[in-house]
Amino acid sequence: MSTQKPRISFEYFPPKTEQGRDKLISTTTPALNALDPAFFSVTYGAGGSTRDTTLGVVSTIRDAGIDVAPHLSFGGDDENTVGSLLDTYQARGIKRLVALRGDMPSGMGGPAQLVYADELVAFIRERCGDHCHIEVAAYPEIHPEAKSDDSDQGVRKGKVDAGANSAITQYLFNVDSYFDFLDLCAA
């Protein structure tokens, strides 16, 4: 089992109103930042539905000098759209990304579109080089779509092989599965 202290981060969904955004930036973020998280992350919404509000929240938090990672899920976006967003993040000094497959709206996906998280990681790494620290999702209790433990491990390894720097998990209830997961990753 790893003896390294776990990193804690806080995940935001972009507020729908200006009042909610103001509260998130002026009250919530400073209060949570006092707990010394490794970073904050901001979700992207299914199919990039919150793309603009994600960018605004991420930029404001970054301008306050706080480490923030936008979620980047392709959700059917083509490589040009994802590449343009990566260029914008780089120009704004964003160095950490959370690369996810994300929830795909029905009817999305196709030959010119990224389909799996490892493809997105490889695309980010190819386009941005070492500029970005790429976080990916990991599932100590096994991804709901995984056929087996082994297939889930293979997917995780594929993301790391594609260029991911580290993996994050969501809150979970089975602490034993988390420690088993850490042992598996260390092996």
Tell where the protein language model's regions lie, with residue ranges.
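Glycine-rich anion/phosphate-binding loops
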Residues: 74-91, 111-116
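Glycine-rich, proline-tolerant flexible connector loops at the mouths of alpha/beta enzymes
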Residues: 37-56, 102-112, 166-185
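Active-site mouth loops of central-metabolism enzymes
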Residues: 7-24, 46, 68-80, 133-151
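Active-site-adjacent structural elements that line small-molecule/cofactor binding pockets in enzymes
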Residues: 82, 129-187
